[in-house]
């Protein structure tokens, strides 16, 4: 499978922007709520919800044909959404919660992320479909 330079650049630019947005969002939320074990890592939970919402909006727009360029699609999904939302931080924070003995908080965080992520994706997709009518 060949990938064009344009696609690589779109993904790279999207990831650059997504990573910066993720960092700034994390700083903002962390400055307002306790986010270290045994507390819920709210910053990553919110970031993952917003990332799923963004992915839903993107996919909804793609399916309506409003964004047809495959390079731009890759830049928005793999790049922007991928750079913004992260499973690695989710895994690390759960490991820290479990090491701290906060088993219930870890379980709630895992469940909230999975259920909330799917719901946010569905909400974003539905919103994009409604707007694109």
Give residue ranges: language-model regions.
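Membrane-interface helix-loop junctions in multi-pass transporters/channels
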Residues: 1-133
């Amino acid at each position: 499978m060949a990938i064009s330079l344009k696609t690589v650049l779109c993904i790279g630019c999207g990831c650059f922007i997504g990573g910066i947005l993720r960092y700034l969002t994390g700083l903002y939320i962390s400055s307002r709520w306790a986010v270290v074990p045994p507390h819920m890592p709210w910053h990553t939970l919110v970031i993952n919800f917003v990332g799923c919402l963004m992915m839903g909006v993107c996919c909804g727009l793609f399916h309506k044909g409003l964004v047809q360029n495959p390079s731009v699609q890759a830049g928005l999904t793999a790049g922007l959404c991928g750079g913004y939302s992260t499973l690695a931080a989710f895994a690390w924070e759960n490991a820290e919660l479990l090491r701290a003995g906060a088993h219930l908080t870890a379980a709630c965080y895992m469940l909230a992320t999975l259920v909330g992520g799917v719901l946010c994706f569905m909400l974003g997709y539905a919103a994009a479909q409604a707007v694109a009518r």
